[in-house]
Design a protein with these regions (language model features):
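Ferredoxin-type iron-sulfur electron-transfer modules and their immediate structural context
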Residues: 1-103
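Iron-sulfur-cluster electron-transfer modules
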Residues: 16-20, 36-38, 42-45, 80-281
Length: 283
């Protein structure tokens, strides 16, 4: 079964596809392939042996045994390989299926890379497919809404500055019942540690801030948290393919820490945010 046999409806993808023309698709695909990629993509495209070892690492493939279209190599075959072979001359219906596959059937986790005998980075290839989809204006609705929040507030949950500081003060008060001398220092210059979190913490899981503050307090750490934008280290734009906004987010994050002259940044739990901070968004 290929992607065309399992299409699902998404208003964001559908709306974006409805505005496409073959000429626009060809222009943007080739602009990305020629202007934003190079020998790396070409090497991956030409060296895959279709051995199938990558399938053993992919949770999508393991969830659909016997269907090669879910394997990492199969996903590349249905998307990037077609774009390269046809030099971007594909129709809007193809783009719909390509977007669904790239956004909903690959997590960019890179587990497949570790089993590939020649080290093909399928996540990089699929990330490039997402980049093309973003520049075409074809992104899943929920993901794009989150990216809009990043663009407007520099966090993914539409948290305003006063709501952020109120959450920190609230958790400091809560924690003092257990740790009377506990403080959550805001905008402290020269601290050893600048602690950053993801936006769902002040929005939904404020107790995680409490718990982190308790650890810092008991460890006697010299630390601080920012009172202004830059505190959210998450990055949905990395997932959507909006690399321009991704760069703005990371710049805001690092400049916030530099402004306070801290020695190091310590992050709360979030795998994608860590990748964005130390790797992708830092390029």
């Amino acid at each position: 079964m290929g992607i065309t046999e399992r299409l699902i409806e998404d208003v964001g993808i559908r709306r974006g596809v409805s505005r496409l023309t073959p000429e626009k698709i060809e222009k943007i695909v080739n602009a990305v392939l020629k202007g934003e990629t190079g020998a790396r993509l070409k090497t991956y495209a030409e060296t895959c042996m279709r051995c199938g070892l990558c399938a053993e690492a992919c949770h999508f493939a393991l969830s659909h045994p016997g269907d090669p279209s879910y394997t990492p190599a199969g996903k590349v075959h249905q998307t990037m390989s077609v774009l390269l072979d046809k030099k971007g001359r594909v129709d809007p219906d193809f783009v719909y299926g390509m977007a669904q596959l790239a956004y909903t059937e690959c997590n960019l986790c890179r587990r497949c890379v570790h089993l590939c005998p020649i080290g093909i980075d399928t996540a990089y290839i699929m990330s490039t497919v997402r980049r093309i989809c973003h520049k075409l204006g074809v992104t899943p609705q929920y993901m794009q809404d989150t990216a809009h929040s990043h663009a407007s507030t520099f966090n993914q949950m539409w948290v305003k500055d006063d709501e952020w500081t109120d959450s920190l003060i609230w958790q400091e008060d809560e924690a003092r019942e257990e740790f009377p001398g506990l403080r959550i220092p805001l905008d402290k210059e020269g601290a050893d540690i600048y602690y950053s979190v993801i936006a769902p913490e002040p929005k939904f899981r404020t107790q995680l801030i409490y718990q982190a503050a308790a650890i810092m307090h008991m460890a006697g750490v010299d630390w601080t948290m920012p009172a202004q934008t830059g505190w959210d280290n998450s990055d949905m734009c990395m997932f959507s393919g909006d690399f321009e906004m991704m760069g703005r987010l990371k710049r805001q994050h690092f400049e916030s820490a530099q402004k306070l002259k801290v020695k190091r940044i310590v992050m709360g739990e979030c795998g994608h945010a860590f990748r964005s901070v130390y790797d992708t968004g830092n390029r």
